[in-house]
């Protein structure tokens, strides 16, 4: 059966953001993205930016650097209890970035004493645990490597008690990540994109940093170079997935499998997407024009952790 394709109206918000990624809103409604591909003298010098959505004006708030090593920030989430950003960085691991631009590197090692790997994307569950993909090798000062060919990508959970726990490994470039919740707010399913294989994997969440029953949950269409990147749930638990290199965003029903709908984009390489809180408006980053766009979806987005009051109360 042919998958239906829709073509909503996309509006460009801003452009010229090298490697545009990680769209996120903070609790004040301010919008942030990251520019992972900025370099200085051929070395990583990624940036975290605030975007004025009315004018498109870009303001760099942070250029993370640790011991002379610049960052490659790639994914963002906003905290609930403090208006701060958690940033997955391919060179520096996990960062906490304040809206004034100050930042902290969270962990050099995981709970087992292993050197932390470089991170790409992250998603909070409603209990406040942060689930993270880590497709890079060890953080700086180790040489920069990525798991595009060798399967050394990992998944971490940064728990509410401050532990950085590796929950699985042996992935070929794990990328986008999302958490599905029960109606009462309990997290119960973790979805992880494995870009080169065009697979979406799922796990059952049994508690903080506790997962089991790994299986293929969904398949990304196409034979192009690329695959699943960033993703977000709408309020009906449809999962919208940026299919990098295909000019489409794939829409999966709650049971996964094949997409039930495709959204055609006016650009080839969508990298991530994020709902504006309590609206149908989706902001999309992409790598053809290094730009941010927006369009209207059929439903509101699922509440983010930063929009909840406390666990179980919405």
Swiss-Prot record:
Notes on temperature effects: Optimum temperature is 35 degrees Celsius.
Effect recorded for residue 244 to H: 27% decrease in activity
Domain of life: Eukaryota
Cofactor note: Binds 2 calcium ions per subunit.
One Pfam family hit: SGL
Result when mutating residue 244 to F: 44% decrease in activity
Record's catalysed reaction(s): diisopropyl fluorophosphate + H2O = diisopropyl phosphate + fluoride + 2 H(+)
Binding of Ca(2+) 2, residues: 232, 273-274
Effect of residue 314 to A: 3% increase in activity
Effect of residue 37 to Q: 50% decrease in activity
Phenotype for residue 304 to F: 50% decrease in activity
Outcome following mutation: residue 287 to Q: 54% decrease in activity
SUPFAM superfamilies to which the protein is assigned, alphabetical: Calcium-dependent phosphotriesterase
Cofactor needs: Ca(2+)
Mutagenesis or variant effect for residue 173 to S: 68% decrease in activity
Effect caused by changing residue 144 to S: 8% increase in activity
Subunit details: Monomer.
Function: Biological function and substrate unknown. However, it is capable of acting on phosphorus anhydride bonds (such as phosphorus-halide and phosphorus-cyanide) in organophosphorus compounds (including nerve gases).
Protein name from the UniProt record: Diisopropyl-fluorophosphatase
